[in-house]
């Protein structure tokens, strides 16, 4: 009889870990966003900048993969508790600020990217892919929140869409 309790205890610990797993994914995405932001901010442009585009592209791809992995984590999670929801809300606020800052840096650096001709179109493609992945991640996380918090969460993440739309519109001007 003692063994029959063990699977239930393991299941309970798995559900408790879901909030932590989503938070870990958000932390990873925030760190990748911050790293990319720093690399883009240090971009010099011109021929010197050509070599600097490789780390930008690698970090951008890493960020995209982290977002996709975060979506898988959120999709696999059970509904979050109220306490987990509060923690996710705090992490979301930090992530929104980081994404907005990064996208502002990307927009500000566009003239330097334009000098290299081929870089701005690649950045545009990356922005569109990251926006799509971010939308999926956001929807997956919001779906795991208790119903009464979902509309609030959608309001918290709305500035990300605005920032992406602005950055994408700026990069579309290249064509």
Regions found by a protein language model. Give the residues of each.
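Fungal secretory targeting signals
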Residues: 1-20
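Mature, structured extracellular domains of secreted fungal proteins
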Residues: 18-175
């Amino acid at each position: 009889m003692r063994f029959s309790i063990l699977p239930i205890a393991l299941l309970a610990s798995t559900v408790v870990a879901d909030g932590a797993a989503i938070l870990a994914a958000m932390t990873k995405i925030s760190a990748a966003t911050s790293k990319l932001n720093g690399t883009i901010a240090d971009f010099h442009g011109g021929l010197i900048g050509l070599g600097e585009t490789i780390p930008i592209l690698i970090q951008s791809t890493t960020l995209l993969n982290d977002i996709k992995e975060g979506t898988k984590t959120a999709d696999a999670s059970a509904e979050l508790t109220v306490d987990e929801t509060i923690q996710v809300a705090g992490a979301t606020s930090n992530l929104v600020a980081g994404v907005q800052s990064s996208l502002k840096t990307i927009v500000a650096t566009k003239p330097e990217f334009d000098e290299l001709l081929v870089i701005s179109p690649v950045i545009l493609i990356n922005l569109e892919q990251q926006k799509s992945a971010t939308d999926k991640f956001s929807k997956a996380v919001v779906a795991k929140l208790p119903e009464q918090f979902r509309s609030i969460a959608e309001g918290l993440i709305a500035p990300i869409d605005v920032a992406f739309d602005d950055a994408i519109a700026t990069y579309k001007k290249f064509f």
